[in-house]
Amino acid sequence: MTSSGKIRIYELSKDLSLDNKDVLDAARKLAIAAKSHSSSISTLEANQIKDFLKKSKTINSTSKSSNKLDKQILSVKKNPVKTQKDQKTEPKKKNHDQTELSQAKLNTLLKPSQTLIKNQDSSQANNQKALKNKFPAQQQITAPSKPNKPLPPNPRVEVKPTISKPLTQAESTIPQSEQKKDGQFINQPKRSELAKKPTGQPQQINPQEPKRPLAPPSRPKIDIQDKKPLQPNNQKAKTRINQGEISPQKVGQGNIQKIKSQNKQNQPSRTPQPPTKGNTLELVGAPIRREKPVNKPHTNEVRNKPVMPSRPGAPKPPAAANRQGLSNRPGSNNKIGGTGRPGSQNRQGPNRGGVANRTTQGQNRPGGNNRAGAPVRSGSPNRGGIQNRPGVPTRSLGGPNRSNNRPGVPSGMRKPVAPSELMQLQKPQARPNAPQRKTDSPTSPRPKRENSTGARPPVNRPTPAAPKKPAHRPGGTAAAPRRTGRPDWDDSAKLDALRNKSPQKQRQKVHIIGENDDALTAERGGFAGEQQAVVLSASLARPSKPKVGKRNNGKPLTALKKRKKETTRQRQRRRAMELRAAREAKLVRPEMIVVPEDNLTVQELADMLSVESSEIIKSLFFKGITATVTQSLDLATIETVAEEFGVPVLQDDVEEAAKKTVEMIEEGDLKYLIRRPPVVTVMGHVDHGKTSLLDAIRKSRVAAGEAGGITQHIGAYQIETEHDGSTKKLTFLDTPGHEAFTAMRARGTRVTDVAILVVAADDGVRPQTLEAISHARAAKVPIVVAINKIDKEGSSPDRVKQELSEQDLLSEEWGGDVVMVPVSAIKSENIDKLLEMVLLVTEVEDLQANPDRLAKGTVIEAHLDKAKGPVATLLVQNGTLKSGDVVAAGPVLGKVRAMVDENGSRIKEAGPSCPVEALGFSEVPTAGDEFEVYPDEKAARAVVGERATDARAARLAQQMASRRVSLSSMSGQASEGELKELNIILKADAQGSLEAILGSLEQLPKDEVQVRVLLSAPGEITETDIDLAAASGAVIVGFNTSMASGAKRAADANGVDVRDYEVIYKLLEDIQLAMEGLLEPEMIEEALGVAEVRAIFSIGKSAVAGCYVTNGKIQRNCRARVKRGKQIVFEGDLDSLKRNKDDVKDVSTGFECGIGCDRFANWEEGDQIEAFKLVTQRRKLTN
């Protein structure tokens, strides 16, 4: 009890010695809230539950005692027990009476349904008492207490459980009070009792045990639910027995014969035969097989399961309950291979998995012997009533109802029926006693069995209609001669066994009903109206085609589907082969391929070689290179792959970028050509004075304002000079001399008319000088050499001429055709002479253009201005550019809003050879692209759309340049560990600057650290760039650009490192230092001192060396290397260092000390101890 005065359910159940479940059930009935055994209830509620449970116990004990009293009173009338020998001779009489009662029960089916309910109990009692006196031996055996009770079925609402009581032989020998107890069978076990019994350990049965005759003779539990009550004459007999008017012996002999004769009058296909005692004894006598008497272990459990009250229409019990050999059905007791006829004791059918002893159940069902397709056996009784009526449904064990004797249905073949639809149709009468059949029925005779106890005349059957398809037998009709020795419906049993073996197959076929089921409805007209309605609905629900037809139709469909799938695969393979063959036929290998810029992606190389990209990837894989279709290949790898396919590779010349690709003058312009100013490009090595020379020409100070004193853009200027008494215009392009600006120099050369090569007199020819020479030659422009810095000490113009002559640039003074002018940009010496020479060279070139047409030219430089937007430096090469013109520069569309000259003055139009800055582009155009003016925007958009694809491909190639795969640098470090990467977001002021920086980054060593440029674009640094850097862990590098509003605050909030540079030298240097910082530091040795061992002191197991420091100093806990001669005998930590028995940190040169190492004690005099320490050193990037 709880502290609050309440009591828990489990405590109450413990006090009452009951289960918690019983107490909870009582609480629920009394509406007391108790959810589980731990629920608490008050003391008042506990008392209510106690009173309720006491009343329930009193009621139960009273009903049990009354039932027990009735049982005892009725059992007084039982006859003495027969001996085992008498029991074995009894089957003939028992079988006879079973036949009579089976015939009598059939006639009750033809009565209205009201009679069924009223007369059931009386007819059962009548038959029970009649058989009790007829078989006294069995009465005595079945007298013992009620051990094994079958599982009761689920109750139905429409019929009470007591109405449809099965009338079997075992129950006919038991009084009514013994058979029923509170509406339930005495011998019927509860579910809990059945669950407790292990199925694998049943009892062994022998003939003397009292449970043996309890086995019902006719059907398992499936048949019991279909039992029909007897006719009213049996009810009267039962009433008279209960009233004591007649004795059970009279009912057993007289009334059964009356019932048998009455039922024979109702048989549709036979003339009734007067039942005589002699005939009954002769025909009912069943042969007793004793060939293989075996007691099966599971006999009791299976035999008692059929004794279960079922009601018409009740749900069918599962078939597995009775499929353990079906040996315990009535009439098939302990006989292996027996046919299970009523009256044959100690027989048990063989256990077949899933088939459940078809021969036994076929013989044991009422009417089973005489249906179409079943054999007529001499040793089995001829059953009357329902045995030979066409259309009477019979059931296989646990399977669906089948009508086996309908006209037109093949013999030996059962058609499955939906269990829920035709439950009312199948009412096989499993009465133990059925009247004998008339021997003159038109059925074929069946041979006698060897062990038959009496001679039996051949039994004839009515000839059924010819089946539509002879199933499993050579003989197609039921009237064909039966085979001797083996029932010819075994084939049907095998078929049903296959159907019942798998429940899924049974459910799939359960709704397939033959088209002849309508005959069943017509012949079973005696059913009640609700039963006819069920038949009608089942008839309407069935498919129109017979089962055989559906089966035949299903097979071709399945085969067709298989063929279709195979055809689809074959078709796909065939099409793939055809496409491959067509592709190979169309593809023709080129004679050679030209590789631009020394790299191609895998897909581009596959397109050039006219092969599949997978072939390229496979070839690379066999060489140890794992590549994708978008990765770039270097020239060496491309040559190796191309050689496999037999195609030579030609390297695209470096000067290709400097060639003039577009002719600015068209045929329509020839009539309107006038002379135009020349475009002069100043080229040379860095710091050789190009911008200073232009300043001297322009008489301005541009070089002084440049960051770091170097040019990082193309500067376009137009000047006027006096020549031959007239003013001439010259357009100068100043290109960067740094090695990173190769693309800029190439673009400047492509649009130029004359190239001025500036060479410093004190430095001579340098790498960028050679590059400028190659660019000028590729553009096929004349070269004028300006030897600068002649005013400096140590200058040697002749040495410069000598070096240039080695590059095939021979001075006019030395007999060549190249003009060389010594100048001094600082002192403005010989500037006029240089300009005069340039004008003379351009006059020879005869430069012309048409100013009266739409402008065409080249984008020299482009950048994104924070205030103005995209700004492009345009060089007009033909025509005249005006404000408002629609311009298409590569894939970029724009409309000129304003134009500014080199001095910042706004102009409205620009003629040939005039450089201007134009505003109004939708985005920053690419430097080096040609621009053209179109008459309207529609025509310009059409051209821009076509160029967009090429531009995207170019950008992709640029982005994939960092992922280039080569044979020489194959990322072998990837196998050792993950390759370190430095992520960079690059923003610059102009497109040319981006190209220069990206080109320089490509030159950095990438063996251990890879530089990944996530984004490179001209313009200012925005918040979007900050977010990208924060998400990817990148560093933002700005070159001559600024940060947008809010970008600085976002960078501080996200912790993004933003670096801004004005000189490309510093930018590249910092990026290289950052890459080196990602490298693992290396450890190097730093020598400390040397000591010599002069004495050895043993201390326990170890030893200490007495040393003299000869060089440097010895420190405690440093690393020590012990050398004996030239051999190193030990290297490890120096653990102890003492001087005069005191621990010291270090000992300097000239002092003695004691040195001890924990891991070394094998000292010898003369050993040298080298002391050193390991320090980390930053690694450098190496190629």
UniProtKB/Swiss-Prot annotation:
Biased segments, Basic residues type: 544-553, 560-574
Compartments (UniProt record): Cytoplasm
Chain segments carrying region G4: 788-791
Region G2, annotated ranges: 709-713
Segments forming domain tr-type G: 675-847
Ranges where the record places region Disordered: 55-512, 538-574
Main location: cytoplasm
GO CC aspect terms: cytosol
UniProt region (G1), positions on chain: 684-691
TM ranges: none
PANTHER family given in the database record: TR-TYPE G DOMAIN-CONTAINING PROTEIN, TRANSLATION INITIATION FACTOR IF-2-RELATED
Family, per entry: Belongs to the TRAFAC class translation factor GTPase superfamily. Classic translation factor GTPase family. IF-2 subfamily.
The protein, known as: Translation initiation factor IF-2
Organism, as annotated: Prochlorococcus marinus (strain NATL1A)
Gene name in the database record: infB
